[in-house]
């Protein structure tokens, strides 16, 4: 039996598995995003390895941005829980996020806005 493997443990130390999310320093699951990207493509599931890492990083950044703004909105209203209303105020208050996220947020309410032409000047009074 010469020339075969020396056994199950041939002197190499077993290393612990490191996920792609940990390698990239991300919280979002790179492997799961890669699987979903592969299932959505028409070219037989050919997606580059870095595409999933890049997509996960983008999603994580946008989520952190929205949550930070929504947290600020909830702090301003002196509550400890982020509601859909706080998400709506955060997204519609930021010009770039507003142009990116055009979806209707259920339970978000409306953004208060009065057109400038409807606001009367301080010196003018309405006469009856």
Curated annotation (Swiss-Prot):
Q: Where is the signal peptide?
A: none
Substitution effect: residue 83 to I: Decreases interaction with VPS72. Almost abolishes interaction with VPS72. Abolishes interaction with VPS72
- According to the UniProt entry, which residues carry N6-methyllysine? 5, 8
What post-translational modification information does the record give?
A: Monoubiquitination of Lys-122 gives a specific tag for epigenetic transcriptional repression. Acetylated on Lys-5, Lys-8, Lys-12 and Lys-14 by KAT2A; KAT2A is recruited by the XPC complex in absence of DNA damage. Acetylated on Lys-5, Lys-8 and Lys-12 during interphase; acetylation disappears at mitosis. Acetylation by the NuA4 histone acetyltransferase complex is required for hematopoietic stem cell maintenance.
Kindly list the places in or outside the cell where this protein is found, as annotated in its UniProt entry: Nucleus; Chromosome
- Write down which residues bear the modification named N6-lactoyllysine: 12, 14, 116
Q: Where is this region: Required for interaction with INCENP?
A: 1-17, 93-103
Stretch list, region M6 cassette:
89-100
The cross-references to SMART domains, in alphabetical order and at most eight, read: H2A
Mutagenesis or variant effect for residue 93 to N:
Decreases interaction with VPS72. Almost abolishes interaction with VPS72. Abolishes interaction with VPS72
Region ranges (Required for interaction with PWWP2A): 120-128
* Region spans: Disordered: 1-25
Q: Does the keyword Acyltransferase apply?
A: no
Q: Which GO terms describe its cellular component?
A: euchromatin; extracellular exosome; heterochromatin; nucleosome; nucleus
- Protein purpose: Variant histone H2A which replaces conventional H2A in a subset of nucleosomes. Nucleosomes wrap and compact DNA into chromatin, limiting DNA accessibility to the cellular machineries which require DNA as a template. Histones thereby play a central role in transcription regulation, DNA repair, DNA replication and chromosomal stability. DNA accessibility is regulated via a complex set of post-translational modifications of histones, also called histone code, and nucleosome remodeling. May be involved in the formation of constitutive heterochromatin.
Q: What is this protein called?
A: Histone H2A.Z
